[in-house]
């Protein structure tokens, strides 16, 4: 157990103070969640997708640190106006990290989680529709796998906690 | 990276008032303490206390008088029982490693609680590599040690037990005397160590009454300078040094003695004990105002640790539900209020405070926890300002959380 310094960039601080596209979207076409409150790191994404499969609106809620809030905010800005295909292909955690001026390495996973949540939302959209385009890979992407891994860790932690409680 | 920090600091420009409550992790060093230390850098006692000249003898005199004073405050029998170390971490390392290695012929089992400070947990992990095994005794929902389990855990092989007098995160005052009696009853040879860093200067503490073999105290936990602490070792208890180097007046810690820090630690102790009752009552009054104020102004909050006289008077540890702790510390910082969180949103595996987990707090409760400690230097106005700022800060972070993150 150790602590690391967290010299966030001005951009992270600005987005923490004034996040863009914050809040639940009542008329969302699709919503997706990534992370787990047990990890202290969780994002909900809301996308409004039109008939041409363009993301008209995106919003988020975040149970997480400043990096989590800032990266989620950036992702909502990035995907707005994009087709689902280019949102899937062009929004990477590296781009998100660059957009916030860089992150302490221990916070990279926040950007990964934000992108993982968007990818989940897109996948869910096509699942709901019942047909998937050819560009959508069957196999999970890096970001989706990472989100899953974090959730698995959270489950393990919670189980350990329950076992401890029963003792 | 430092450029980033400069920008962060710039964002704090124009703060009207500052209230520092993160006294768990570092503190101000009051002017009286600094003033007491300054002459020892260049005017007197700057020599090596083992050498044969005036500045050396001055240093010797200063260190011995400091040991004498601290031995009195701790209720030790003789000044030789006080061993200065560079801090609480080092004193705990010396206590555990020193006692374990020196007495390993008596057994290789160690008993600690689940909520010992991080440095104790880490040292016992290290000792595993040397064949020692550690049993961690569980605590109840307020952090009190399970004495039955303690009794079960101690046997003829138990070389050492280490139980902090007061938990540093949730302020639980342990029944150390009862715990010691249980341990010694099962095995009179078992050495008993207590980290008393969070008790020293806050609750009545007397190592002879407690009958502990070893006790750790720390300077910065009583508003002294960082980088100095002490390990009390009862006369006759066998503990060898754990570092090699030139030994001087401090038989268990090699290197040249840091006389100015020892003077600062002693001065801080004097200030804490000079008006002990008044100091403690002041801390308690402000802590109660803080906690009561939070409960009055905000819903979905939980106090971590016990209430009443089983809680150390300076400690406030509150979980703000539906609120992530690190985010809240930043939000408060921008308003001039400085606190720390039991959230550990800084690693891939985000484990929150082991203490909060041990008392059965949910992870989301631990992630939303804030630790604060009052001191004799805080004023009513400081706490009033904190209470003005906290509702809007919590509500803003809860606004970001929205409907997510509820388990």
Regions found by a protein language model. Give the residues of each.
Chain A
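Short hydrophobic/aromatic-rich motifs at helix boundaries and adjacent loops
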Residues: 3, 15-18, 44-47, 66-69
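C-terminal binding/interaction regions
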Residues: 2-27, 31-32, 82-167
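Active-site- and interface-proximal helix/loop "cap" or "latch" segments in soluble metabolic
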Residues: 38, 48-112
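Short, surface-exposed loop/turn motifs that are enriched in glycine and acidic residues
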Residues: 2, 33, 61-65
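Structured beta-strand/loop patches that form or line metal/cofactor-binding pockets in enzymes
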Residues: 22-55
